[in-house]
Amino acid sequence: MAKSSVAEQPVSGEKYGFDAIRGTQAGREFYVAMCPWKIIPKLFIFNDYDIPPELRAQRTLRETRIPAIKDYILNNLTDYTFSSLTASVDGSMDFVPFPSSGKDGKLGRLYINMDSRLLINDGQHRRKAIEESLKENPGLGSEMISVVFFQDDGLKRSQQMFSD
């Protein structure tokens, strides 16, 4: 398992900070960060129970899929592969480029207000399988997964991100 310093750090008790890469799609900024598995269950929520199906930005979580993904992780500790989680942030995000990359730099630190809701648009089954895997093997907490963060532009945009 990869050993890495934790990428997330509470900042002033009000924000999370992540080393990130800034990109642009269709005129909108987005950010890619490496997140340790141990924070994934705490950071990301599901909206299945709070919102009627026709208003959800994501598919309903199918609990029957989780054991197979969890087993895939636990049975392939040195040889599993996961694609990125995609998340919407409904609060403030501030990106500060590293000084060495200049004011328009693409490498920097992403700060997300701790009061923000972070909603997974794609990857909720992976997220839940990570949570279940950690219960059986807490040592996986230092494993990393890439997360693509988008500003939450409302339900219609979130549904579009999930369907694409």
For the regions a language model picked out, list residue spans one by one.
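Basic- and aromatic-enriched surface patches that contact anionic nucleotides/nucleic acids
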Residues: L77-M93, F98-D164
